[in-house]
Amino acid sequence: MHANTTQQVFQELSFNGQWRRYQQRVLDSCKTYMADGHIHLVAAPGSGKTTLGIEFIKQFGQPTLVLAPTVTIRQQWVDRITTAFLANPLHAEQLISQDLKNPKLITIATYQALHSAMIQLKGESRAEDTDDQAEIEHFDYQGFDVVATFKEHALGTLCLDECHHLRNEWWKSLEAFRNSFTSIHMISLTATPPYDDDPALWKRYITMCGQIDEEITVPELVKENSLCPHQDYVYFSFPTQEEKKQLKAIDIQKENVLHDISSDNLFIEKIQDCAALTGRISIDELLEEPKFLSATLIFLHSKGCSYPKNFQQLLAVKKLPPLDLEWFEILLQGALFTVPHWYDFTKDEVKQIKHQLRSAGLIERKQVKLCRNKERDLLLTQSLGKLKAVQEIFSSEYQSLGANLRQLILTDYIRKDFEPRLGDENAKLTQLGTLSFFESIRRETVKQQIPVALAVLTGSLVIIPTAARHRLEDLLDADRLKFLPVGCLNPNDYLKVYLFGDQHDLVGAVTQLFQEGFIQVVIGTKSLLGEGWDAPCINSLVLASFVGSFMLSNQMRGRAIRVMPNNPDKTSNIWHLISVNISKNTADNPFESSSTWANTRFNGDSPDMELLNRRMQQFLGLSYTENVIESGIERFNFGFITFTKENLTRLNEQTLLRSRLRRNLKEGWREALPIYDNMEVVQEIKIDNKIIPHVKFWDTQKLLLLTLATMASNIIFYIFQSIRSRSGQVPINIASFLLIVLGLLWLRYFLYRSPYKRLKILGKSIQKALLNKNFIQTQQTDVQVIQHDKHAISTEVFLKGGTNREKAVFTNAVLEFFAPIENQRYILKARHKVSDQTSYFAVPNLFSKNKSDAQEFANCISNKLRNYELIYTRSEEGRRILLDARIKALSNKQDRTSTKKRVISPLK
């Protein structure tokens, strides 16, 4: 395509909205960023990332390939260009292609499609994170040269949307394609940059995308009224009686299998006489995987069997813990898969044990799963107890908002097989899905006589209130619509809708009904997000989805926190469902008697809780306990409670009450957001005070010796003077001088012994090392420490200033410095014997590539802190020292560090 023609076509792309202030800030600087041919934007959901990406494409003004992670997101790009940038939507077909074989000025495809084209694949693929309307891409790229095609098309710009969420083989194809175009312009867009990835993966990401140019955060968007004040709420549910029976049956089967294995005399003898305990495995190798040695001793101890006590001394533990599922899982994992040569089981014996475990579903992909297994997790994540939870959330939200409620419930599956039973009060709800949630809430509205209009909105099934029919016919040509009864529902209440033609029109029209209040609750699937769908009216979102990536969770959450122009007081609640099993059996630990085990407790980890924990690592939100904005599950403040059914039920009641105080929520955000410009998100690292190294006192010691020498000479002088004057008294100024000097020395010692001061000095030492090697390039950064009272057991440190990546680099370096010694390449060893937990520290990975880097890091640390020598652990002497360091680390296995994000003012 000729350059002039290309420019003329691009002139037709013109944003028909008004740029927000932070968007305009990015656009004002984009020419500068584009000077090197790259622009890399990190932007929270709701910031208009896709819209900015389209504007960047226009600015570069060259044929462009946009790559998206899924088919649904690919469609979002098409919809956004059509609705927001084209005066005549009919021109979209001339401008946009979704087919790699037939590129146009803007070609939009998935990463998977590009990978398939690069390897010339023929076939189809079902995408992950989808519902009944599976995202299936059909490929026939045999004999197709995608690189040659786009070179002929004069490809000038490559736009990558969330490119780090890729499988390794897709990455390789993307890199090969990118490297085929030496002078191509790059646009990179993401809401979740891989800050915490391995340095090699981060380098790969930055090599592809370029350094991050701009970042737009959620708090910034709330501050500028581009996103509404919002809060995440956690609601606990419990399995039904039938599910409890199934869970109990799983536990009993597991208990029987484990009893048979652990009580087998041959099994016990093999463990007792294993190679690990009879000198056939080196001490060095045993300490490579100390958990397997620990599990072996714990098992034998629980059986009352003898074992060489020197191995317990090697682990530096005086008392072994009782055998439980976790330790037995570790033992079986080691014996069957990880270190089978430590044990003496024959092939037939291993085969028999594996068969026993598989029969109870306790092995998955060469991993022994006693604490958690797929069957049990599936029962919990898909527990029908969540139906009741959503009912209660709906009732509470309606009580709070009444006719103003606009609730969206997103789930994974439609469950069309239940459609004929909709409206049948006696029909049993047996699966979670769009239709079961619809029916559950519908029954609740009938029971409470609540006049709430519900709707089902998915790619293949739409149900609306009959009262909204005429308005829908106003929005769409009535001749294109077909209304049918659905299931056993009264046609006067609900109708199923078909549309002849483009289904996007129906989705848009039903969304308009939602906006106007003809519908108050929409139940849909995640695929709805890919329909170019947006509904700013949403003020209550229930994430009833248990399948999905963080990226998709981010998208779902972003739908609820958009502002509504005609409702400036809008706030939004986001609900997360957690199914937990509270049991009265001993299946958690079949190795203990019921008399010594709690009668009612949280039975095992919840997969929902694990998912929530992952989600909250990146989501910044308002803390429950104070008006601060931070990430992490700790902000919900339920870590202090015992997980009993009574406690969790009470917590649910408190959560519902809190969720109804929407005015307080808005006020909380107002107080939490700094009133200053240029707010900053920092990554706080909490560190146990016991492991913070001590400050070096060489300068103090020198000062003390010099002072004592001076004092001694002065005393001698005054004694002679006294003798000569026959006064018989040492002048009082000697004593005063002595007290002042000793007081100053004691004050210096007192100040430098505080964890706050020590951590500040350590942080600055690590910062200096990172600056010296250009891992941090922003000079205007500062290490800050949060000071607590003297009874605090931990202290927080963070890097203020710099880019988010530089903050992540600092955070990772601090975490790696304090990490338990395992098999690090370089470690630091205190030159003088110490009695606390500060004998050994690890050299962070960034400095472990070679000795000179490691030595430079060690010099920065030893310059201000207690003297440490650098140890190379791959030498013979180094291995001996590493062994000692591991032993000390094993005796201190509790969590030493943790991290979270927090928003601070630049004045703090």
Feature annotation, model-predicted:
Residues T72-K101, I206-T207:
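Conserved helix-turn-beta segment of the N-terminal RecA-like "Helicase ATP-binding" lobe
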Residues H115, A427, S440-Q449, V456-N627:
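Conserved RecA-like P-loop NTPase helicase motor core
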Residues A113, G123-I187:
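SF2 helicase catalytic motif II
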Residues T51-E55, Q59-F85, T110-A113, W170, ...:
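Conserved Walker A/P-loop ATP-binding site and its immediately adjacent core
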Residues A44-S47, L90-L95, L100-T107, F144, ...:
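Conserved C-terminal RecA-like helicase domain
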